[in-house]
Amino acid sequence: MAGAKEIRTKISSVQSTQKITKAMEMVAASKMRKTQDRMSSSRPYSKAIQGVISHISKANIDYQHPFLIEREVKNVGILIISTDRGLCGGLNVNLFKTALSEIKNWKEQNVEVSLGLIGAKGIGFFQSLGLNIKAQHSGMGDTPVAEELIGIANRMFEAYKEGKIDAIYVTYNKFINTMSQKPIMEKLVPLPELDNDSLGKNSDNWEYIYEPNPQTLLDSLLVRYLESQVYQAVVENLASEQAARMVAMKAATDNAGNLINDLQLVYNKARQASITNELNEIVAGAAAI
């Protein structure tokens, strides 16, 4: 059995670690709430653009933007959004499993796959696999800036317009609630058929005058909409990261508390044994006299 002094040192070490994990839990909780607010505030913007795009595209316009046209899929682009930091449980592992499963499915259909990576963890993982990486970005911090994300997104979109990619998907961790985050893959382009519910039940009867013309407006709005979708995915993934980190740090704090209790019990037994030995020595010495 370890000595009492050694056990006290272990208890002190675990207590120090417990303070760190508790602080990280509280910081993650605060950041998660801020990210949730950012996530909620960006949704109406994306929804409003979606409604206008739907109305224009259904207004009998003789113009079809490339982002709205389905074509034979020979090359697929996947934008994978991971975290820059660890200590967030199995968040990235589950995301990578989802992405690898989809990549495998595409390759079994003889479809080439190109990746766009956001997040240091994803960059490190997929680079080690030797996959085709078109673009990458890391170092977003806790408050991602849309302008910094537009570059990597536009490189994927330009490849689509040039015919180098036939479809683009985004993979990220969708924030369900504090205890649940789900890795999902969503199609970015060609855009799935949009509805115009956000414009109201009688939106089909509304007449608009578009300046300078519907084609120019649609071109601009589609790019803005896709950029907002990428930003929304990044923010949702960030909220998932903070939630997962908060849960992981709480579990670590609780485990540290249990370990301290166990060590305290061992310490008490060691101290009791030490006192018993001392008493036995005293009794033995007295008997010898």
Swiss-Prot record:
Record keyword Transmembrane helix present: no
One biological process term in Gene Ontology: proton motive force-driven plasma membrane ATP synthesis
Subcellular location: Cell inner membrane
Gene Ontology MF annotations: ATP binding; proton-transporting ATP synthase activity, rotational mechanism
Record keywords, A-Z: ATP synthesis, Cell inner membrane, Cell membrane, CF(1), Hydrogen ion transport, Ion transport, Membrane, Transport
GO cellular component, one term: plasma membrane
Topological type in the membrane: Peripheral membrane protein
Annotated signal peptide: none
Predominant location: membrane
Subunit structure: F-type ATPases have 2 components, CF(1) - the catalytic core - and CF(0) - the membrane proton channel. CF(1) has five subunits: alpha(3), beta(3), gamma(1), delta(1), epsilon(1). CF(0) has three main subunits: a, b and c.
Cited HAMAP family: ATP_synth_gamma_bact
Family statement drawn from the similarity comment of this UniProt entry: Belongs to the ATPase gamma chain family.
Known role: Produces ATP from ADP in the presence of a proton gradient across the membrane. The gamma chain is believed to be important in regulating ATPase activity and the flow of protons through the CF(0) complex.
The protein's name: ATP synthase gamma chain
Organism: Histophilus somni (strain 129Pt)
Gene that produces this protein: atpG
